Amino acid sequence: MSSSVAHADHHHEETFLSKYVFSMDHKMISKQFLITGIIMGLIGMAMSIAFRLQLAYPDTSFPILEWFFGSKWAPDGKLDAGYYMALVTMHGTIMVFYVLTAGLSGTFANLLLPLQIGARDMASPFMNMLSYWFFLLSSIVLLSSLFVETGPASGGWTIYPPLSALPKAMPGSGMGMTLWLTAIVLFIVSSLLGGINYISTVLNMRTKGMSMTRLPLTVWALFLTAVLGLLSFPVLLGGGLLLLFDRGFGTSFYLSDIYLGSAGALEHTGGSPILFQHLFWFLGHPEVYIIIMPALGITSEIIAVNSRKPIFGYTAMVISLMGIAFLSFIVWGHHMFITGMNPLLGAVFLVTTLIIAVPSAVKTFNYLATLWRGNIRFTNAMMFAIGLVSFFISGGLTGIFLGNATLDIQLHDTYFVVGHFHIVMGCAAIFGMLAGIYHWFPKMFGRLMNKPLGYIHFWFTFISAYLVFFPMHFMGLAGVPRRYYAFTLLPEYGVWFDVNVVMTLAAILGGIAQIVFLYNFFSSIFIGKKSGTNPWQANTLEWTTPEERIHGNWPGEIPTVYRWAYDYSNPAYDEDFMMQNVPDEGVEEELFETSKTKVNKSAKKPKPEAVTLFTLIKNWLKPNTI
Amino acid sequence: MTTQAPEQTGRVNPKKFSLWLLLLGILMLFSGLTSAYIVRKGDGNWFDFEIPSIFLYSTIIVLLSSITMIWAYRAAKKDDIKGIKLGLSATIILGTAFIISQYMGWLVLSDQGLHFVNPKYGDKVSASFLIAIAAIHLVHILAGIIYLAVMLINSFRYKIHKKNTLQISMCNTYWHFVGFLWVYLYMFLYFAPDF
């Protein structure tokens, strides 16, 4: 296409502002999303360590807490009970929306969609830029609520009324809640602008030969994620608007004549707080898949590349993603089993929920089958991808427990739920995101991340994540409720004190491991080893772009696609990978007569090296090579 | 703006496609709200009332405005600048009339004792629902009128003609969508007491 040439002609000088700040280049926007996501992630993690300290040592004074949060929120080095709730709420909000929705989808959809489908940029680069700026604004508004006098929102990230609908319900329900709602409205705008763009880009801007069945699974996952966001976020917006009417104008959509200790009975009558739960979880459940699906897509890609094998069951992977996407809209009731729901309706939600196990199991099976007898390269990204598979299994199994309406009556609002969703959604998605960062870091910055530091990061994070979240299941089975400030007043939970201490120490260990990651990430931008164009010998189109990462992605024509994304270890070729833009064998034969001999030579497959602990350690100790 | 046109491979214009996706999102917003209506009604303690007839006039006005919009769009395709201006102006006037008519509808409701805020009458949340749904819809109509005004200004600058119909065709799509969205909402609210 000639536009690329024309593009080079009127390439204007870029200033610092237009290149790094008000950039419309999808690669720069992806970095902006990533860095903002990392900062938000650190804040969310710091909060979790603060309240874990409280849970493990409810009676101990930590001067550092007072120094950090001030004497109002942590008098005498002990977290204030109300502020504990605020921290839990903000931790949930930040992690769910700001890190794992915007940080994950925003980063990788922006980076990978145009590069992997062969487009010069998004359908609307301007909307893309707006999407980031709304996200940043939303983050700032949310964080600013930490500094208001009455404290940030404290009613849980699910903002159930009446705590969210009644400004006088508790301190955090006032200004903090207003800022929370403002931030989320901005966030929804950002997410819709981004999502519309992603869908439009994938459907309309694929390069020649890139049929939907040749798309890498990352693109499929990010595409379906965007569809989920587009269909579910507006419903939350509707629910949020009714909430704003209740807060601001005094309507009674969600509020009824409940009795408040301080203010007596409310003036509202007839509102239904359960209605809000329906509207919230109609978004809330797809949101869980908005979080996990990009991570699954990233994992599919990384596992195939590093096993040097085609992904097992490509079509099944796509269909299972679609199945998960579809089912996610008809399972929201499983968050509400104990709201006095009609048992028949509960049974329906139970069945739809358990059906999700089918596509999820298909995906897990396919990951394992791809790994099976693969020529596995244990890169940092691969470790995190395998970590995701581990979390997806162990967290998914507990999902089957919780999906049972009868069991859920016992387990609801206990630590079992906390353990379940942190493993299957929190850890799995974070590991997917980290895997993506390690894998596509060379594409973003042209350098490799330090490998030994990556292994340290992986093992400490992996072990600490299981140490923190696995015991929670046992606590939940014993009936320990979530969201309690201190268990000192409840002697029946005394047996869990030591466990709480172990979990907190593990959380701190996990936090320290992230410092290793941060050092590795930021130092590698400047001093990492140069990566070359295709460091992982992958097939997808992003590795055909030049190292300079130019505006418009490809200096000449956009490559044409001749094959699917997973032509690894095909015995017909010399190399164990065949990039998507390399013409078919038939076409090749016309150009080079020698291709026949190639076939015979490479038909003999080398015997894969047996993976032993020794070879694993040997590989990890190697410097940055692959 | 961007330094290069996005390369297409012979599919629908990405901008137009993005608009369709936006409309899909808006549709989900209103399906959420009308579902909330049904769920809340199912809980009981609900005051059923007939939707005032003035909302029928709104519906007729918004349908008429769709016809004038078609007129403007056809004029654009025929390079009839005067027709574009007249059609767009008529659509803006009808859109404004729709807003006034909706507002009068709320006044009629108010006369019947059905306010947006009905403290102590929990069953009259039905009226809050009607007004909230209509108001959120009205915001979309307002956005449509702004869009139409931009188109009108562009037509005075001769930016809309036979060879540049993308903008007006997107505006056309949006306006029909919000119009028919109201028709759906009206029918929903009309038949809702019988659910």
Language-model segment annotations:
Chain B
Residues 1-195:
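...captures the hydrophobic TM-helix bundle architecture rather than a specific catalytic motif
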